[in-house]
């Protein structure tokens, strides 16, 4: 690997996240927080639980940021095979669209990411904090990561607050609690962002839509002339399909079924 590859945006972002995660954890252990008090009293269950949650959130972060989000295969296929696939999967009203950047036929709900330079299946968004797309393959893990990360952040926020001492002279307080207070503010900001992200993504999952579709539905060919979301199968089935892949089936098939139901005359 070339030396300059170590300075790629992905490496820098993931290294920064890892350093920040363990740096904040170290601050919570070094100051007079409940975490340190438990450790000094020999009550190691809660400190170990906190460390395991931090480690779990970090491993989930790395998994989501490094895994294939659902890239569309760029290998060329025979023309006849493409025609058969298009006929079988996509209704005539909405033919497969060829990406003008990577020249692949995009499945329904796929979109080209300019940062990754690839088309991604069930594209949600490109996450700059992970330097990776969130798509069909890693979106469920992304939601699980957000939930675990929020638990860690809120617990860390409580621990930071437990170590703050306000009734001290200004200079002494700054030396003893300045870094911990800065950590508290940072955790407050991260907790707010993680909460908003988790709530918004749970809403998207519950309605079987994506960030891109929610924001740009008026510009997306398969959504802009539909009065409702054609992929919404109800809360239970949406959650089951998102997290467990059940019931299975292509988005093209589901879209076609909804189109037939919408066009069939009322009895």
UniProtKB/Swiss-Prot annotation:
InterPro entries in alphabetical order: Palmitoyltrfase_DHHC (IPR001594), PFA4/ZDH16/20/ERF2-like (IPR039859)
Positions annotated as active site in the UniProt record: 127
PROSITE patterns: DHHC
Membrane topology qualifier: Multi-pass membrane protein
Enzyme category, top tier: transferase
Sorted UniProt keywords: Acyltransferase, Endoplasmic reticulum, Golgi apparatus, Lipoprotein, Membrane, Palmitate, Transferase, Transmembrane, Transmembrane helix
Subcellular location, principal: Golgi
EC nos: 2.3.1.225
GO cellular component: dendritic spine; endoplasmic reticulum; endoplasmic reticulum membrane; Golgi apparatus; Golgi membrane
Tissue expression per record: Widely expressed.
Gene Ontology molecular-function annotations: palmitoyltransferase activity; protein-cysteine S-palmitoyltransferase activity
Keyword Transferase carried by entry: yes
Annotated catalysed reactions: L-cysteinyl-[protein] + hexadecanoyl-CoA = S-hexadecanoyl-L-cysteinyl-[protein] + CoA
GO terms under biological process: gephyrin clustering involved in postsynaptic density assembly; negative regulation of NLRP3 inflammasome complex assembly; peptidyl-L-cysteine S-palmitoylation; positive regulation of synaptic transmission, GABAergic; protein palmitoylation; protein targeting to membrane
Segments on the Lumenal side according to the record's topology features: 31-43, 162-178
Coiled-coil ranges (or none): none
Subcellular location: Golgi apparatus membrane; Endoplasmic reticulum membrane
Cytoplasmic side: 1-9, 65-140, 200-267
Ranges that cross the membrane: 10-30, 44-64, 141-161, 179-199
Domain DHHC: 97-147
Chain's role: Palmitoyltransferase that catalyzes the addition of palmitate onto various protein substrates. Has a palmitoyltransferase activity toward gephyrin/GPHN, regulating its clustering at synapses and its function in gamma-aminobutyric acid receptor clustering. Thereby, indirectly regulates GABAergic synaptic transmission. Negatively regulates NLRP3-driven inflammation. Catalyzes NLRP3 palmitoylation, leading to its degradation via the chaperone-mediated autophagy (CMA) process.
Domain notes: The DHHC domain is required for palmitoyltransferase activity.
Family as reported in the entry's similarity comment: Belongs to the DHHC palmitoyltransferase family.
Protein name, UniProt field: Palmitoyltransferase ZDHHC12
Organism: Homo sapiens
Highest classification ranks of the organism: Eukaryota, Metazoa, Chordata, Craniata, Vertebrata
